[in-house]
């Protein structure tokens, strides 16, 4: 390849597609959108270091920008564009609206495929088994509830056979009862792939076949991370062949942290050891005790016995830790700086050889089942081997997860990369947990060093005007090209940031809750529509309970129904001229699209600082302080600024929107960091009362 991949031909293709799209939409060029297209094209056209970060304010048109820049270039050099989102809502918008619009109006020819995990698809084999064996009593291999879903499962089969349903969870219209879906889906260990009798009709493989040769694949962060964790190229194309676009990229570090966390419950594991012996023993009996299975199940039983003794000792060692109560049902102990005491690390080390042998034994058992499915084992009833792939595969997955946790704790005092480690305890069990506090090193290893190119974008990537926190958490070098593009909206003319006179300190739960309760009736009477955001369920419940009954009964409170149902009811009320007020916590502070009259007022009850007793946040702060840094100003305040911008972003979604954001936390005025938080917001018109 030449030094500069961004040839005049590719530039002309990008510019031509943009002009064609603007003309077809009767749009005028947006400066911010053009700037975003240029930045992405320049980065992806470089000979190396093809990663950039673009913060694009609401109204920029970022989806069109990154598609118009990436697709023509990827097409020319034979790469696949992977558009990854954090939410289903944006994923559906990209697939159903944005990409079809570009195909139709920009003159670009490209194919699109939607990628979802195997667990989102119905498994015909499991569905058929449930219907076939629903009247039988002896089905130990199925892990389902006692509830009879046979009528529902028959309807699923009918619709799939008729072509009125594609076998995908999100396209099933009616709500599914709890437990119904898990009975008819599987994972990669429970799937016999092309050896399955239903392979040609399989919903998952039909969808996966559509990925082959697709120019653009739309996925989500969880699926991309799962693919990368498997080495890349397992579900999606290999990273070296992909240009990734992470939309809603501010979620990427947290998603990575969650994906690569590990945990194990002590009593649950002891019970699981018994389950291993039950499953393998029953399978061995089912196939008339062939010698190879008898040997494996006997060896595995020996390992579970020895491991059970170690886990019992581990339970005793953990029980003497100085736990602190977190709520009425749970206690927690966090290891300072993630250092595991030698006595506990030694027990985990002692368990490693046996756990490795257990993993190997279950894996070999699973391999023999696969051989039987392929017709390579002369067992009695070998035709039933496929039925056992899922339960044995689930044992295999849990064994590997437990091994990873033990390895983490065994190395807890000597690892290169820092982890938060803590113990949860309730009256039933003790849980060991570990989570990376530097997810960036994982992303660097599995993504940044391997991918052909990548664009990270969102409306909220800077904190207090700097990309430093995002780059640090994501594992990107400080010199990564990073651009912030302002929203085209005229905020001073259309939006007000209001801080009323407040008496209470938000850190005084009772006093602040009482004052919020007194202020809300008047605040909510000012507009027909409002979104009220709390930082904790505890305060939300306390305030809603204390509000006047006539007001409280009309609120649409998160948790009283599904998110979709609440929003639908909210829209119905506004459409019919009624008042409607949504009330929720952090998950309502982003991802809600309530344009126009659907949201004229956002009330933020408290500054969105992280929960002070979260073990991961505590560990991050502890490490920062150990390095001589100020954790509050370097971590807590920037993170709160980012969340505050996201919450305020619920107000203005389109250029004709207007309204008010009200902040019921006087610290934004009285504390030293308050001015920095205000300056990080869009340029609202400020209405700040004198604060006591």
Residue ranges and their predicted role:
Residues 2-19, 23, 28, 58, ...:
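A substrate-engagement module of RecA-like helicase motors
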Residues 41-43, 63-77, 97-101:
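Walker A/P-loop NTP-binding motif
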Residues 46-68:
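Walker A/P-loop
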Residues 72, 89-92, 97-100, 188-189, ...:
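Signature of the SF2 helicase/ATPase Hel1-core->accessory helical subdomain module
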Residues 182-217, 226-235, 365-503, 510-512, ...:
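A contiguous, basic/glycine-rich beta-loop/short-helix subdomain that forms a polymer-engagement track
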Residues 445, 500-535:
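Conserved interdomain hinge at the start of the Helicase C-terminal
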Residues 500-510, 560-669:
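Conserved RecA-like P-loop NTPase helicase motor core
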Residues 535-559:
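Conserved helicase motor "Helicase C" RecA-like lobe of SF1/SF2 P-loop NTPases
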């Amino acid at each position: 390849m030449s030094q500069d991949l961004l040839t005049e031909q590719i530039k002309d293709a990008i510019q031509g597609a943009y002009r064609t799209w603007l003309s077809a939409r009767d749009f005028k060029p947006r400066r911010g959108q053009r700037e975003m297209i240029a930045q992405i094209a320049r980065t992806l056209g470089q000979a190396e270091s093809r990663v950039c970060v673009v913060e694009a304010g609401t109204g920029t048109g970022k989806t069109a920008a990154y598609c118009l820049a990436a697709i023509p270039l990827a097409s020319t050099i034979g790469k696949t564009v992977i558009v990854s989102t954090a939410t289903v809502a944006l994923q559906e918008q990209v697939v159903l609206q944005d990409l079809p619009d570009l195909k139709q109006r920009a003159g670009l020819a490209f194919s699109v495929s939607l990628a979802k995990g195997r667990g989102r698809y119905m498994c015909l084999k499991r569905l058929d088994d449930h219907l076939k064996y629903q009247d039988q009593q002896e089905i130990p291999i199925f892990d389902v509830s006692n509830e009879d879903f046979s009528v529902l499962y028959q309807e699923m089969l009918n619709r799939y056979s008729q072509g009125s349903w594609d076998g995908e969870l999100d396209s099933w219209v009616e709500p599914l009862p709890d437990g119904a879906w898990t009975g008819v889906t599987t994972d990669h260990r429970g799937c016999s792939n092309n050896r399955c009798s239903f392979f040609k009709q399989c919903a998952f493989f039909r969808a996966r076949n559509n990925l082959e040769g697709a120019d653009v694949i739309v996925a989500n962060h969880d699926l991309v991370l799962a693919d990368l964790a498997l080495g890349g190229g397992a579900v999606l194309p290999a990273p070296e062949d992909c240009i990734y676009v992470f939309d809603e990229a501010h979620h990427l570090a947290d998603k990575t942290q969650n994906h690569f966390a590990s945990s194990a419950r002590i009593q649950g594991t002891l019970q699981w050891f018994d389950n291993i012996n039950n499953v393998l023993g029953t399978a061995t009996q089912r196939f008339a005790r062939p010698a190879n299975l008898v040997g494996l199940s006997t060896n595995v039983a020996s390992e579970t016995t020895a491991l059970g003794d170690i886990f019992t000792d581990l339970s005793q060692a953990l029980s003497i830790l100085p736990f602190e109560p977190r709520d009425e049902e749970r206690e927690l102990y966090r290891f300072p700086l993630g250092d595991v005491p030698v006595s506990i690390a030694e027990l985990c080390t002692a368990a490693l050889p046996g756990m490795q042998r257990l993993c190997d034994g279950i894996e070999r058992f699973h391999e023999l089942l696969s051989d039987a499915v392929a017709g390579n084992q002369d067992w009695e009833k070998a035709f039933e081997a496929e039925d056992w792939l899922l339960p044995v595969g689930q044992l295999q997955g849990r064994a590997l997860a437990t091994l990873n946790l033990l390895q983490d704790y065994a190395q807890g005092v000597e690892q290169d990369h820092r982890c938060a480690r803590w113990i949860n305890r309730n009256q039933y069990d003790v849980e060991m947990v570990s989570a990376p506090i530097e997810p960036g090193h994982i992303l660097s290893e599995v993504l940044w060093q391997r991918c052909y190119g990548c664009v990270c974008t969102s409306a909220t990537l800077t904190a207090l005007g700097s990309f430093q926190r995002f780059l640090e958490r994501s594992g990107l070098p400080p010199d990564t090209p990073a651009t912030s593009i302002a929203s085209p909206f005229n905020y001073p003319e259309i939006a007000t940031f209001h801080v009323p006179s407040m008496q209470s300190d938000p850190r005084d739960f009772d006093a602040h809750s009482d004052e919020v309760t007194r202020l809300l009736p008047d605040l909510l009477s000012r507009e027909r529509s409002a979104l009220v955001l709390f930082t904790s369920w505890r305060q939300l419940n306390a305030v809603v309970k204390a509000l006047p009954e006539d007001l409280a009964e009309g609120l649409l409170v998160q948790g009283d129904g599904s998110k979709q149902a609440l929003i639908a009811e909210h829209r119905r009320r506004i459409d019919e001229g009624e008042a409607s007020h949504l009330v929720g916590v952090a998950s309502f502070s982003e991802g809600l699209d309530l344009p126009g009259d659907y949201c004229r007022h956002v009330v933020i009850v408290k500054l969105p600082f992280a929960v002070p007793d979260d073990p991961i946040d505590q560990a991050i702060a502890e490490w920062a302080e150990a390095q001589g840094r100020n954790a509050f100003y370097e971590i807590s305040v920037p993170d709160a600024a980012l969340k505050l911008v996201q919450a305020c972003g619920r107000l203005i979604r389109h250029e004709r929107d207007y309204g008010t954001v009200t902040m019921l936390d006087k610290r934004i005025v009285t504390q030293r960091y308050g001015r920095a938080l205000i300056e990080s917001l869009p340029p609202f018109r400020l209405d700040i009362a004198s604060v006591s």
